[in-house]
Regions:
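N-terminal signal peptide c-region/cleavage motif recognized by signal peptidases
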Residues: 13-18
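Extracellular carbohydrate-recognition regions
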Residues: 21-61
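Terminal, low-complexity interaction segments
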Residues: 25-36, 137-211
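Surface-exposed, low-complexity/disordered Ser/Thr/Gly/Pro/Asn-rich loops and linkers
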Residues: 54-105
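Extended extracellular/luminal ectodomain segments enriched in beta-structured repeat modules
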Residues: 104-113, 169
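Extended, low-complexity, turn-rich repeat/linker tracts enriched in Gly/Pro/Ser/Thr and Asp/Glu
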Residues: 106, 117-124
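Conserved Ser/Thr-centered positions that define the repeating blades of beta-propeller domains
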Residues: 128-131
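A short, hydrophobic C-terminal helix/tail in secreted or cell-surface proteins
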Residues: 214-233
């Protein structure tokens, strides 16, 4: 293969690779598994296994337990993030749960998904909330309802692509919090034959934020490739 043709082929491959980066990709993900596998689901990590971000508790206490039943493909050492210590019945609507902070700088068309397990006495309704400044949160969409308890509800998802300010935002954050049943002032237990209790638990796994690079990012990639091609052709003469 002559030099100009080799250069053209290389640029074509690089351009195809760059274009693939404009497709939806996982920006950040938490699988809550131990960074160093230890064959114990009672241990885990709040560090993302993909990308960067922080996971924190909102008025609850946390622990690690088995993630078996979620979409996590890990065959062993599959942990989930368990939470308990939810509000007394009739109080604290949408104030307790979990929070995740993820910078979306350079990305748009943001979407969030997660797997969630509810114990029998846990609140069956969960509200998704988002924040543009990491402090003030806004409800988004209807509550997620899950029944019966002791069950994983996988691939819960929200599409935030229509919300101005979510993309390209260093302070983007979101929460999943326990909610009263719609049009009531009380929590309902995940299993209808059970009674809601503050000791009920929620467990999370495979919390993921997906996004698409902004057009400007792709344009810079192509500009860089064009410059590489120009310099390579110049040297080949």
């Amino acid at each position: 293969m002559n030099r100009p043709l080799a250069i053209a082929f290389t640029l074509l491959v690089a351009s195809t690779a760059a274009q693939s980066q404009t497709q939806t990709q996982t920006l950040t993900q938490w699988n809550f598994n131990s960074v160093t596998p230890d064959a114990s689901t009672a241990t885990g990590s709040l560090l993302p296994n993909v990308g960067s971000g922080t996971a924190t508790l909102v008025g609850t206490t946390g622990s690690f337990a088995s993630g078996v039943g979620s979409t996590d493909p890990a065959a062993i050492d599959n942990s989930g993030w368990g939470t308990s210590g939810y509000a007394t019945q009739g109080t604290g609507d949408r104030t307790r749960g979990v929070q995740f902070n993820v910078s979306t700088v350079g990305f748009n068309l943001i979407a969030v998904s997660w797997d969630q397990r509810l114990s029998n006495t846990a609140a069956r309704s969960a509200q998704f909330q988002y924040s543009l400044n990491g402090t003030n949160f806004t409800d988004f969409g209807a509550v997620f309802s899950g029944s019966p308890g002791d069950t994983w509800f996988n691939n819960r998802s929200v599409d935030l692509s229509s919300v101005a300010g979510v993309g390209n935002n260093a302070n983007f954050a979101f929460r999943v919090v326990a909610a009263f049943e719609p049009l009531t002032s009380a929590y309902a237990a995940a299993t209808t034959s059970s009674t809601y209790a503050t000791t009920g638990t929620w467990r999370f796994d495979q919390v993921s934020v997906t996004a698409v690079p902004e057009p400007g990012t792709y344009a810079m990639m192509l500009a860089g490739l064009a410059m590489i091609g120009f310099m390579a052709l110049r040297r080949s003469r």
